[in-house]
Amino acid sequence: MTTLVGLVGWRGMVGSVLMDRMTAERDFDLIEPLFFSTSNAGGAAPAQAKNEKTLQNAYDIEQLKRCDIIITAQGGDYTTEVFPKLRAAGWNGHWIDAASTLRMKDDAVIILDPVNRPVIDKALAAGGNNWIGGNCTVSCMLMGVGALYKAGLVEWMSTQTYQAASGGGAQHMRELLTQYGTLNAEVKALLDDPKSAILEIDRKVIAKQRSLTEAETANFGVPLGGSLIPWIDKDLGNGQSREEWKGMAETNKIL
């Protein structure tokens, strides 16, 4: 019997890359995919679908329970709402998640198999079924130095990173690109005039940035187009951003 694998969040930033990768590596040949949607239940499933041609409601616990494995890139809010309900309903399948929500739970394993494959194998043999993707900075960092840690050659390390806006997800990316379009439209006439003063263009761009509405900055909370912000997650109130905390806590858990 073919393994029934539910996919949630497959249209977002992370999910789109995953779909491309699974298609290129012919992973869909090995499974029966069941596609879920939080906004378009009843719509047509993508081309990778086989027998399950209709999008299912991603909040329908009974439909989710059909799956042997669920892969979700829908984000932390979805995991927070659905995962406990699904487990409480008696589902014991494998939950594979890109979000950070479950990473530090005792019954979850952060997946970075080139570094912690023995941990993964041990958890699988013991009946583990919560497999969580790690923070991107942590994963890239440990891929580079994991072997040095295993050899006992590293006492401590420090890492610095710029977070990409895409780390917030597809809606954050849409907001950023829309802001760029808004700023361009504000000064397009001046840009088209080779005699226009660059300082006047600069002033108009800044003024437009500062006047963006709450709706235009709903995801990031502030104008990001043409600017920088300290983080895209949150301030923990102790001098650390959540991203910095992940760099320490997740690294130690993986190791």
Q: Can you say where each PLM-predicted feature lies in the sequence?
A:
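Oxyanion-binding "anion nests"
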Residues: 208-255
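N-terminal Rossmann-like NAD(P) cofactor-binding subdomain of oxidoreductases
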Residues: 1-218
